[in-house]
Amino acid sequence: MESLIEARGLRLRYGSKTVLDGLDFHVPKGRVVGLLGHNGAGKTTLMKVLVGLLQAEGELKVLGLEPRRQRVQLLESLAYIPDVAVLPRWATPAQLITLMSGLQPRFSAERARKLLQRTSVSLNDKIKTLSKGMVAQLHLALVAAIDARLLVLDEPTLGLDVLSRKAFYEMLIDEWCDGERSVLISTHQVEEIESLLSDVLMLNEGKLVLAIPLTDIDNRFSALGHDAAAADAVAAAHPLLRYRVQGGSAALFEGQPPPELAALGQRLRPSLVDLFLALTRQPEINRSQGL
């Protein structure tokens, strides 16, 4: 399968601090990939490397191009919304559509207007009068109207309420994902986007601790729900993570639980949140409370 991103040994340092530490991964076409990590894990830095804003050591091809050296050519087929994306407050959506038509040869003004019809944003509204959720939907409509092959989103729903986040992701899936184009989304709101993803990349302190299609999670990891009587036996098996669930406790293992534990509990499907907590070395939590 064709890869839209190929990275080998990506490394970036700021002075004595290693921000990206030898990352190896690829993103095939037609995928929705979650780039997950806590604040400071290196997500934004990696995205800036992918779009050519920063130079890293190692080998990197995005859409077959070298991002730093061929950035102008790359941005013809790549759309990017950074975490600090700002639209001019004085402008209207109609003015931004006109501006984009002159700047981006692959931009379709007709498609942008069509996408905005599914939102509550009017073409003649001033940006300064729009809510955060409306601005996010406008921004997505503008980039989704570009005939690009790869969409890179850095914390696109940060600061939005639940309804606005839901509307944003529904629009993303409906209007962008077509089996050929790919999306890379960075977030620490793991539970919220799990159902949207086909693949996941997990960063922890600049290291890639997991790169996996979601369909492979059940083959590599397992969870065991158990009661208090089995707690000591489960702990002795050194699970990746122990956590509380409604009605008892659970433990996450790489591979299958030891055979001697099978009769002590119930097999559970590990969630992406559980893996995230286990692989980014977070302490025990009550899963009912979320992250």
Show where each model-derived region lies.
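Conserved structural motif at the start of ABC-family nucleotide-binding domains
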Residues: I5, L20-G22, L75
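Walker A (P-loop) phosphate-binding loop of ABC-type ATPase nucleotide-binding domains
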Residues: G37-G42
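Helix-to-loop junction immediately C-terminal to a conserved catalytic motif
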Residues: V51
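Conserved ABC transporter NBD signature motif
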Residues: G58-R69, Q73-L74
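ABC-family P-loop ATPase nucleotide-binding domains
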Residues: P82-H139
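Catalytic Walker B motif of ABC-type/P-loop ATPase nucleotide-binding domains
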Residues: L151-E155, L160
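ABC transporter nucleotide-binding domain
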Residues: A167-F253
